[in-house]
Amino acid sequence: MNSRIFPAAMSAPYAPLQPAVVVHDEQGRLYSAAYGDVYHSRDDAAGQAEHVFLRGNGLPQRWRGRARFTVCETGFGMGLNFLTLWQAWRDDPARPRRLHMLSLEGHPFAREDLLAVLRAHAPAGLQALATQLAAQWPPLLPGLHRLEFEGGALTLTLGFGAAQQLAPRLTARVDAYFLDGCAPRGNPAMWDPHMLQALARLAAPDATLASWCSAGQVRQALQQAGFAVRRAPGFGGKWHMTLGQRLPGVATPDDAPDDDGAPVLVVGAGLAGAAVAHALALRGRAVTVLDAARLAGLASHAGHAAAALTPVIARDDNPRARLSRAGSQRAWLRWRDLPAPAAPRRCGTVQLERDAGRAAALAQTLQILQFPADWVRMVDRDQAGALAGLPVARGGVFFADGMLVRPGALIDALLAGEGISTIAAQAARLRRHGAQWQVLDAQGRQVAQAPVVVLANAADAPRLLADSGLLEPLPRLARMHALAGEVTLLPAEALSGGPRCVVGGEGYLLPAVDGWCVAGSTYVHGAAQALTGAEGQRVNLDKAAGLLGQAPAAFASLQPGSLPGWAGWRAVLPGRLPAAGPLAHAPGLWLAAGYASRGLSWAALMGDVIAARLCGEPGPLETDLLAQIAPR
């Protein structure tokens, strides 16, 4: 894989998603009032999918004998093309080991509506798959959503939003295109030449395309995009459809797998490293993790009883908000099936606002974003208190997807995956030797080597790169600093059993774990050590009291300095966004660091960003976001 840094795409003004509305025409066909067209052929929707899109792309024959195959679709609709493709893949004993579908949809159905239309329109043989699709259907939030089926062997990456805005921001190596969507007369943007060219840049050398549409301007646009096109007999009442083949000599994407199947070495066994190792192991890669903490007989996050994962929102839906939203969804989908106590508890988060002015501004933000109310909604003080099960100081917003996570248990579970081995060692220096990167200890002895090395060692990453002569091209990374902080454990009985959900604002207070509620946290600049102590505990007690409106009477018996707690470091980069991706000046070296206070938000997402690029999969993030987090 070419370890390039993605250019930042120009940002378009935010436009909220407009969900699809279930409407049927007089013949009982699902109908789009927005575009004045039906969703499928009047004869047989699944038959159209098989005739036009599968046979039109030479499937299943073309995918046989391949390790992976990627399909790109415009217009997901109710998902019949995907379900038909899925069934064909299941039925073929010579299928590729991994099948990826990337599909764009400007007007997605809500989960309940999707299930209803599939119950009404999908054939009986696809109903079981339709149920699985609906069960994983994401909330109607703009951006990319990665779903996994068949134990991860089949992935569906949904792009919710305008196709002409999403298409230039996709990363993939596409083998077949399903060009669907409503007719050009009603939805010309779906067939815009610039949009088709943006999709065509993803085409593999032998890529094919198929579309039910045979309009002359569409065929001409596809020819200009680098395809040899022809008409073929259509399906049902249509005389013709369009087929295409990538022309030889046209530029192809450089997102081919990097050392496909080769072992990977991860430096760092904290949350970042564990998540990268887990993501790679799920894809069948052998991973070795270097754990410096084990040299001292320690475990990462030992004593860190619980932490919170809460998304953020912004009026302009800026990169931090988009990354946070994607990260929280990825964390839940990746970790929810882990064994207890590693699996997150999706208890929700009440995020309190400081004052009435900020609450009014937040209400305006939600009105602009128009996110689903079952994902985020305004709550007044009484509603917030009812959700928390305790009186709180103010109202704010409620994030239904807020989670409580036990970091130590999570890291242990991620590193226990099949294909992951751990070595107790400290990386002192990196050295290139042929096609391998060697990791040396302080005595210059080789600890491990691999063609691909991921540095996930937090604030030690700049030191390691500097000592290896590799830091100079990375000025942002060179400015990373370590910020100490501590959390305090409060007895749950002092809080009437503790809150039912995460309570956040100026600090945070978490639901009880093993009889203790975590209150946090402090920020200590310039500290020589990360320590718990009386001053930090006093700060955390005051923050907890501020969230509740007043200190509970039982707080009077809690003596700062005598309470249990945990202290650690945050690796902070300028802009407080993480750095994840390849190092352009050192092929084979990758970075996953700088997670600051949002390690839980970034870890699963950054792990999948790196693993997807290493394994030649469609990317789970848009290129403008990849540019924001690219190591530099």
Swiss-Prot record:
One of its GO terms (biological process) is methylation. It is found in: Cytoplasm. The gene is mnmC. Residues 267-632 are annotated as: FAD-dependent cmnm(5)s(2)U34 oxidoreductase. Keywords: Cytoplasm, FAD, Flavoprotein, Methyltransferase, Multifunctional enzyme, Oxidoreductase, S-adenosyl-L-methionine, Transferase, tRNA processing. GO terms for cellular component: cytoplasm. Its main location: cytoplasm. SUPFAM superfamilies: FAD/NAD(P)-binding domain. It catalyses: 5-aminomethyl-2-thiouridine(34) in tRNA + S-adenosyl-L-methionine = 5-methylaminomethyl-2-thiouridine(34) in tRNA + S-adenosyl-L-homocysteine + H(+). Residues 1-247 are annotated as: tRNA (mnm(5)s(2)U34)-methyltransferase. NCBIfam families: MnmC_Cterm, tRNA_MNMC2. In the N-terminal section; belongs to the methyltransferase superfamily. tRNA (mnm(5)s(2)U34)-methyltransferase family. In the C-terminal section; belongs to the DAO family. GO terms for molecular function: flavin adenine dinucleotide binding; oxidoreductase activity, acting on the CH-NH group of donors; tRNA (5-methylaminomethyl-2-thiouridylate)(34)-methyltransferase activity. Catalyzes the last two steps in the biosynthesis of 5-methylaminomethyl-2-thiouridine (mnm(5)s(2)U) at the wobble position (U34) in tRNA. Catalyzes the FAD-dependent demodification of cmnm(5)s(2)U34 to nm(5)s(2)U34, followed by the transfer of a methyl group from S-adenosyl-L-methionine to nm(5)s(2)U34, to form mnm(5)s(2)U34. Pfam families: DAO, Methyltransf_30. Its EC number is 2.1.1.61, 1.5.-.-. This is tRNA 5-methylaminomethyl-2-thiouridine biosynthesis bifunctional protein MnmC.
